[in-house]
Curated annotation (Swiss-Prot):
The gene is rpoC. One of its GO terms (cellular component) is DNA-directed RNA polymerase complex. This is DNA-directed RNA polymerase subunit beta'. The keyword Transmembrane helix does not apply. The lineage of its organism: Bacteria, Bacillati, Actinomycetota, Actinomycetes, Micromonosporales. It comes from Salinispora arenicola (strain CNS-205). Zn(2+) 1 binds at C60, C62, C75, C78.
Amino acid sequence: MLDVNFFDELRIGLATADDIRQWSHGEVKKPETINYRTLKPEKDGLFCEKIFGPQRDWECYCGKYKRVRFKGIICERCGVEVTRSKVRRERMGHIELAASVTHIWYFKGVPSRLGYLLDLAPKDLEKIIYFASYVVTSVDAEARHRDLATIENEILAEKRQSENSRDSEIEKRAGKLEADLAELEAEGAKADVRRKVKEGGEREMRQIRDRAQREIDRLDEVLDTFRKLEPKQLVTDELLYRELRDRFGEYFTGGMGAEAIKALVQNMDLDAEAESLRETIRTGKGQRKIRALKRLKVVAAFLNTRNSPLGMVLDCVPVIPPDLRPMVQLDGGRFATSDLNDLYRRVINRNNRLKRLIDLGAPEIIVNNEKRMLQEAVDALFDNGRRGRPVTGPGNRPLKSLSDMLKGKQGRFRQNLLGKRVDYSGRSVIVVGPKLKLHQCGLPKQMALELFKPFVMKRLVDLNHAQNIKSAKRMVERQRPVVWDVLEEVIGEHPVLLNRAPTLHRLGIQAFEPQLVEGKAIQIHPLVCTAFNADFDGDQMAVHVPLSAEAQAEARILMLSSNNILKPADGKPVTMPTQDMIIGLYHLTHRTSGERGEGRAFSSDAEARMAFDNGELHLQAPVKIRLRGLVGVETGPGAESWTAPEGWVEGDPITVETTLGRVLFNEALPPGYRFVNYEIRKGQLSAIVNDLAERFPKVALAATLDGLKEAGFHWATWSGVTIGMEDVLAPPRKREVLDRYEKEADRIDKQYQRGLMTAEERRGELIEIWTKATNEVAKEMDTALPQENPLWKMINSGARGNLLQLRQIAAIRGLVANPKGEIIPRPIKASYREGLSVLEYFISTHGARKGLADTALRTADSGYLTRRLVDVSQDVIIREEDCGTDRAIPMQVGQQTGEAGSLVVHEHAETSVHARTLADDIKGPDGTVVAERGADINSILVDRIVAAGVESVRVRSVLTCESKLGVCGACYGRSLPTGKTVDVGEAVGIIAAQSIGEPGTQLTMRTFHTGGVAGEDITQGLPRVQEIFEARIPKGKAPIADTPGRVRLEDGERSRKIIVVPDDGSDEIVYDKISKRVRLLANDGDHVEVGEKLTVGTIDPHELLRILGPRAVQVHLTQEVQEVYRSQGVLIHDKHIEIIIRQMLKRVTVIDSGSTEFLPGVLVDRALFESENRRLVSEGGEPAAGRPVLMGITKASLATDSWLSAASFQETTRVLTDAAIHARSDSLIGLKENVIIGKLIPAGTGISKYRNVRVEPTEEAKAKVYSMTGYPETDYGFGPASGQAVPLDDFDFGSYR
């Protein structure tokens, strides 16, 4: 087998019959599989050992040769080669067909490639292939022209002869009729008898006349058809074709079936065809030009490649290796077999029958029928169900053909090449491990022993506990006590990977140091649950063991959970104390007046703790404590900031008014962090962790998080927070409030009954009334709840729940929606604490069910979106440090605020400007340089820029990056998950796709009706994101001005027209069929600028691209996506969205090909287009003209240069058909293609830059070595290199560790 590391490209092409025979190890002649008695393969059958290799290692069929010493011998008795049985996975056979057949992919695919090549309609092609019509394959026009006069004379003579015989026959019959009539008259027959005889005679004469006329017409038709006979002409009348063949067989050839197609293809002159098509494109218009372009693509593909178009017609069919289509014996003696065996059997049966019929000299009609059946059998083998009804197996199930083996989620690409099951892995239920450190996980002993079995066995032998591997294995299986000690030693410092499905982003797989635990559940650190989105209600996780030293190093350095604290989407910490820990820290830092020990002063924190231990001081009592080693005091958001006493220096002792709890809280924070002297809730904690992440090393951050976790759990236990029925306090004035609003509602109902308002108005009024009522009851509840209430504590601290949920439990359920999503104007007045009535319960179930259904749909949709995003961006990798471009994009850093117009940091600066590279120097008003070009923008720099009064800066962006492949580090900016400059080799495309796809599930599904505009749908949430990335024309699209000008409105009967009168006096632009319901943004007489929206609605990005160009579209799409995510409170950095948009705008449509090889109308990569044009201009040629195109992500994925990647994405057969015809070569640049062929992916340390590192000793080191004495003088000689891979099985590398 070929070693995957020895090639850089993979080409796909059309296999000719010679190729297939070359691959084959023998012809399969019989449809038999295995003998039912001996269970051994039948000779020359589908499992024949002679063709495909032996079933048992080193053993021939008849048993003459057994053992490895006969390796390579071919048995003279049974003809089987003595070799390994695994060759049955790679050796192919073939079936020699008795008649040619066409390949269904090329004939039936859309568009039909055979049809384009031969210029035949698919309908006609089908008639020819399936023996319904004859086709003329060649005409000897010269001979026909030469002999036409003779032939016409012959036909004329025949016609005359026919006319003469007709005349003589009629004359004879007329004479007989006269004689008969005369005889009857003489006999005195009745008039009606005479009439009947006369009519009979005349009818016979008419028939003679008609017969002769038909004969003459047929001769005319034959001559006429012959005169006009052209190659590729169809003759559907069989009798006509036979007569043509019998009379003029030497002037033309023709036939039906695949043989005729083969003859047509052989007779084609591709060069002449291509030239004539190019001429048509130059001169033609409309449909003719479009068809010529499409045909030229196919013709040029065969001209420019080594492909022969004859590959589309098969003379022999390859048979894939038997172990890839196995036959397995089931219990009870029956066999389960792959569907392919049935399909091959059909082909072989029909082929053998056809051979026999041909040998017997059967009539043409029978042979043709058998040929058609053979064609259908081969079609079913290649792509069952593509044409006609699929071939079915038992239970009417369509059989899986070769195409089905590749297609879809269960196909070869997605099931076995992109996702494989791996060894050294296990899975189990997870439980919380509150005692673990951030970088640890608890691994069940039994599981660890199984996973690390080889390591344990080797170590047992090393330590002389076992003599050899075999006895070590026995020791492990019997679980001897010494085994556990060795296991403990082996797993120390050996990280394992934990993964929880679904792995939505890179934090779904992290590395941990395993700690052996009892039981069978994996223990997880509580802080990593957010990243895995794990909880302990029965979730399971998988464990994988990295084996090689490199894999272990990567796991430890890159994937360890303590190094994955920041979220790739926005660079914020994801490892946050949650729930119990927040309650604990809230309790710890809460301040309560009037508690024991309030107002006392302590000389040190130790003294205060002693007072607490003795029961003289309450944790939350305000006291004064003298603290040492402080760098400052943080008083929290909204409070007056702390001012240091005069003369105080950092580190000096200082007395602070605080609580003991806050002192204990600060002990968890790293030294050198300001003293936190305020109540800790979720938001404040998040800000602290954010701050720590920016200012302290990862080690300190991990230790702090562990400290916070410990403190949180400990004090949560101490706080004794519980919920009882008594804690759910109903608002005392609830009844009174509801009665008041009930009267209001009655008043509205009465007005409606009197006809004073419409049903719609009544509904609106009622909803408004009950919304007010609900809010008022909720307010009542807020005031009634005491601060000590545990529910209030949970909500106030941000640990769990919100006021809306509490309102439903304790106060009032409020208004609910029906299944359509409309609000029911009658509220549920009860709370869950009081209990709902039957009707209330019934109407409240609607919303709950819809919620569950929505969530299920959303999850599937979101997963599919992520898959498409990954596919489109998978080859965007950081390829170089800096592409050196001067291009950049302007971005807002600050925004004006208030009346004074002071400049503050822009609200979205964190997700737009942060983590980017400055493109220019930033100068303040006085001309001093505030920030230099190439600086990394962080929050400190942003503050400095805004303080200097600068509102907008130019930054580098992936949208303007000029790297040929992927993007460069400078244009990408800082890596968000690491907080450092991005490394060359980082797979930023996949990170971008994950960052956008992962929060997809949180986005709402619904497209809802806005209150103001009745019936106008606004797409929101996930469907809107899909609409943007698929570049679809949006629902409710708004027209935009093509040119600056004045607006004129014209109202029609049902719709209105907007007319823009351009400023430059050119023709007016009319936008018609605009609904009267749509709100206008430009009124009569207004002046509009180019690209301005004329009505309310969504802009069509394709229009925007046409009018304002790519930059406007990039800004628009980024803003639109961000709008959806921000509405749900999800933060995603712009750069992730920009990477996807860059991929969507990567192609250019060629309008005029100039002197280039590009065909007009084809999509070309922008970089290739520009470099080709530059080359032509430098050589004095005419450059091509093109137009940028916005492609949806699905289309962009399928248009990628890598056919492997596209085929594994969607429409597998179409992609492979196209790639084979164009003999596409995949240069294995992206990640998917390398995963598919089993190479190391070119990202991270797998990128060639890092793979080709050589260690060069310095000159001093060399001199030092050369000056060393005591080395024997030796000359090493090497034999000539073979250039082949060395089989690693033959070498002993000793220890792997």
